[in-house]
């Protein structure tokens, strides 16, 4: 197929239209997280290392909570596997326990780990809609609901990263990226 539609925005991209408009020989449409993994060599000097470690293979996991939740895996810095991990539901019921929330509805991982998730969970608990930035400010000011939400977010992110690192055997590291 020559077209893709974004899942969290109202955009549709078509390779034929892009090729014609920009007079290109070829046009490849990539998943956003596939592009992020391919860009590693171009941005590696600006990466902030949170924890040093020894690599035991060349598999790197890229994860980014932002508007949604994106992820990809790069093997030997050549083969990139794009994922739609944000749309998965396998572990979400147990992650809701990090926020002391019970739900009978279908919840995706990005409903728990993303900037919009922080806002939505805060609204569920406080009946007030705030941006994730405003909630982080409240967290710094020791607001109990913001603390509960941010602590639940961090626990959920850590648990999910652990599961994904095991799933993809990312012995080359885990890189966090995105707008959050």
Please place each PLM-identified region on the residue numbering.
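Glycine-rich beta-strand-to-loop/alpha-helix junction loops that act as flexible
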Residues: 1, 32, 64-67, 171-180
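Glycine-rich phosphate-binding loop and adjoining helix at the ATP-binding site
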Residues: 2-59, 93-95
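Generic secondary-structure boundary/loop-capping signal
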Residues: 3-6, 10, 82-85, 106-110, ...
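Short, functional N-terminal and low-complexity linear motifs
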Residues: 4-5, 85-93, 126-129
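ATP-binding/phosphotransfer module of carbohydrate and carboxylate kinases, centering on a glycine-rich
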Residues: 20-23, 73, 97-180
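Short, well-ordered, mixed-charge alpha-helical segments that flank or form enzyme active sites
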Residues: 36-39, 69-73, 120
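Single-residue recognition of alpha-helix boundary sites
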Residues: 42-43, 77, 125
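Glycine-rich phosphate-binding loop of actin/hexokinase-like ATP-binding domains
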Residues: 51-110
């Amino acid at each position: 197929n020559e077209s893709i539609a974004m899942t969290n925005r109202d955009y549709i991209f078509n390779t034929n239209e892009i090729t014609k408009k920009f007079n290109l020989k070829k046009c490849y449409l990539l998943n956003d997280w596939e592009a992020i993994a391919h860009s590693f060599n171009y941005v590696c000097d600006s990466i902030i290392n949170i924890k040093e470690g020894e690599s035991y293979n060349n598999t790197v996991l890229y994860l980014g909570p932002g508007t949604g939740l994106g992820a990809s895996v790069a093997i030997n810095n050549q083969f990139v596997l794009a994922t739609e991990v944000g749309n998965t539901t396998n572990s979400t019921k147990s992650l809701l326990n990090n926020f002391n929330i019970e739900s009978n509805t279908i919840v995706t991982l990005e409903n728990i780990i993303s900037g919009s998730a922080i806002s939505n969970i805060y609204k569920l608990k406080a009946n007030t809609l705030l941006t994730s930035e405003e909630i982080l400010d409240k967290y710094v000011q020791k607001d109990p609901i913001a603390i509960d939400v941010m602590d639940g977010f961090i626990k959920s992110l850590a648990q999910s990263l652990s599961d994904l690192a095991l799933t993809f055997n990312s012995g080359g590291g885990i890189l966090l990226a995105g707008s959050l």
